[in-house]
Amino acid sequence: MSFPKRLYQKIVSSSWQLGFIRDGLEGVLSDGFFSVNWVKSPYKDRWFADPFILDVTEDNIYLLVEEFRYKYPKGRIAKLTIDRQSFEIIDLKIILEEDTHLSFPNILRRDGKIYVYPENANGGKLNLYEYDEANEKLVFVQTICDDVIWDSCITELFGKKQMFTAHR
């Protein structure tokens, strides 16, 4: 990647930052104002976006996120461990990398298993992966959709499974 393009990416991309609303949804809905605990990242060569909560313990918050390094301009899916007191990232593991850009690692929990279906619009399809907790990686299960779609959300509505997505 050329220097001007890298510089542009760094300037534009550096504005992404993860945060947690302190007052929860009730505080936001009651008065419309909220304060944020911003996640402190030790990484200056990348940013994180599209957070989905994998787990919360007494000490830590575990997120699946899009990780984007300036040096390699494509997203990867990472698992972040965040300290609940300091809101500092204390661990980072890449759990899925493809040849194309990945983002929006939406989580689906079914029958005691955790599935993830990250956006892969550049790859032209939406794949389903099972989260292998022991090895901290995503294992391919099947292709959900052979089309270019963005930010998909699978849910149950009116007694039926539904998928909401964006298409260009």
Per-region residue spans from a language model:
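Beta-rich carbohydrate-recognition and catalytic domains
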Residues: 1-49, 54-102, 108-168
